[in-house]
């Protein structure tokens, strides 16, 4: 059961206060996310930000009894589809502000990392979506219709903050079902992100890292899985000034040791194994182009006949420290799960334009960042699932509160018209019932006036 909130907590105000504290309105203006007339871009953005906690999509909300709290559907979709908005810059500005605050809460020597990974955003039933492509899903081991969401995040071991993303289509034209719309002005931010969506995955990954560093986001290492841990990638990240820790596959790549080239399994014979531990040992070698790396051999609990190999370009780290730091990579997997399960990543809007998908993804990333901000500021040990449902329940409880108070007021009004004997009997029963309820229900009826 999710923990009950105290009587004075107001989730909407709490979320809105975080938005104000982070100066979201200023960040939107800096990223050219503005409107020339009508309701402000800040109000539209804040509505879309909180929409997921209402338990309804945009269509259902605009057809509900609370539709007076919203503006027209066209206003929201024009906002999502605008090609002039620089969502990439907005997310970088927000993440830089949040990571700076988180860094101030920890000691300077604490390791901070950038985590790189991808996840497929499916559009299985779509046909006319802009830049829709045939992409490979490494989880289900088959091709899907949709996009590869390449994501870069920041972590200090306690918090995870999404820094940037690229909704990759496909670098191969033969794998793309749709191309860039002819109506897009080539001078806009929208056209630029469309061109970036057709970059190869390694090129897009390096671009994300360089942008994060240019925005002032500080990190000591980049963590990657087996797909990204390649020699060209290591070289590019070293040029950018960052060391890498990643897992490597047992392929045909060779590493130089004592003047000879060996594969990963062949290097095992040079390591003194300690079978009683999970970390068997390590060895320092060089890659084909001369990059010195440290390879740590770790027990594979899923398949005891094989080992796992962790590679670090920082050879000064101990074996245990390399394994510990690499464990922070799990935070991005939790982020993907939370974003898709709770924050409706990829399912909240089914628009056909690439701009709408980018703006929606940025809104989801912003939701996650603000939830993390609230959790960190309050030193809250809740999981993201608990925090999400706490927000939803509080909004629903406010509606229930109003309903109960209105019902009781109507009851008291009709009650006053009855005879004195019946009134005394009913008043006694109602008072007895109220006293048997929980304290938060009793508090709703403290100010009831029984006199006509």
Please place each PLM-identified region on the residue numbering.
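Short, positively charged, Gly/Tyr-enriched micro-motifs
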Residues: 27-100, 108-109, 155-161, 198, ...
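A short acidic (Asp/Glu
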Residues: 125-127, 230-237, 253-260
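A short, flexible helix-boundary coil/loop motif
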Residues: 1-39, 51, 67, 167-171, ...
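Short amphipathic alpha-helical "interface-anchor" segments enriched in bulky aromatics
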Residues: 110, 114-120, 319-350
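Active-site-proximal, Lys/Arg-enriched surface segment
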Residues: 81-172
């Amino acid at each position: 059961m999710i923990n009950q909130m105290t009587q004075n907590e107001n989730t909407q105000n709490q979320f809105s206060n975080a938005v104000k504290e982070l100066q979201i309105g200023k960040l939107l203006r800096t990223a050219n996310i503005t409107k020339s007339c009508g309701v402000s871009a800040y109000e539209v953005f804040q509505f879309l930000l909180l929409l997921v906690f209402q338990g309804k999509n945009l269509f259902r909300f605009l057809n509900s009894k609370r539709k007076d709290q919203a503006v027209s559907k066209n206003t929201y979709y024009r906002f999502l589809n605008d090609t002039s908005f620089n969502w990439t810059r907005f997310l970088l500005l927000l993440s830089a502000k949040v990571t700076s605050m988180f860094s101030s809460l920890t000691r300077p020597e604490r390791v901070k990392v950038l985590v790189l990974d991808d996840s497929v955003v499916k559009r299985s039933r779509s046909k006319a979506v802009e830049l829709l492509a045939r992409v490979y899903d490494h989880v289900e081991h088959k091709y899907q219709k949709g996009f590869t969401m390449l994501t870069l995040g920041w972590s200090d071991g306690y918090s995870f903050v999404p820094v940037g993303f690229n909704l990759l289509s496909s670098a191969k034209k033969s794998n793309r079902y749709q191309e860039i719309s002819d109506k897009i002005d080539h001078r806009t931010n929208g056209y630029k992100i469309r061109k970036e969506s057709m970059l190869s995955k390694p090129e897009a990954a390096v671009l994300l890292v360089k942008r994060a560093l240019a925005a002032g986001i500080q990190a000591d290492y980049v963590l990657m899985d087996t797909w990204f841990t390649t020699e060209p990638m290591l070289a590019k990240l070293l040029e950018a000034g960052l060391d890498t820790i990643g897992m490597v596959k047992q392929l045909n790549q060779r590493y130089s040791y004592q003047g000879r080239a060996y594969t990963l399994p062949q290097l095992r014979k040079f390591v003194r194994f300690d079978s009683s531990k999970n970390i068997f040992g390590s060895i320092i070698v060089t890659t084909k182009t001369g990059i010195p790396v440290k390879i740590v051999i770790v027990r594979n609990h899923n398949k005891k006949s094989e080992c796992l190999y962790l590679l670090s370009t920082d050879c000064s780290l101990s074996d245990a420290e390399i394994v510990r730091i690499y464990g922070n990579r799990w935070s991005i997997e939790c982020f993907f799960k939370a974003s898709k399960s709770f924050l409706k990543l990829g399912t909240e809007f089914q628009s056909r334009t690439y701009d709408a998908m980018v703006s929606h993804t940025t809104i989801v990333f912003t939701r996650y960042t603000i939830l993390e901000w609230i959790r960190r500021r309050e030193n809250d040990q809740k999981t993201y699932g608990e925090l999400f449902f706490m927000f939803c329940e509080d909004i629903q409880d406010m509606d229930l509160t109003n309903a109960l108070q209105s019902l009781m007021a109507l009851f008291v009004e009709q009650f006053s018209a009855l005879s004195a004997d019946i009134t005394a009997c009913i008043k006694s029963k109602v008072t007895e019932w109220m006293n048997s309820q929980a304290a938060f229900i009793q508090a709703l009826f403290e100010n009831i006036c029984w006199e006509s």
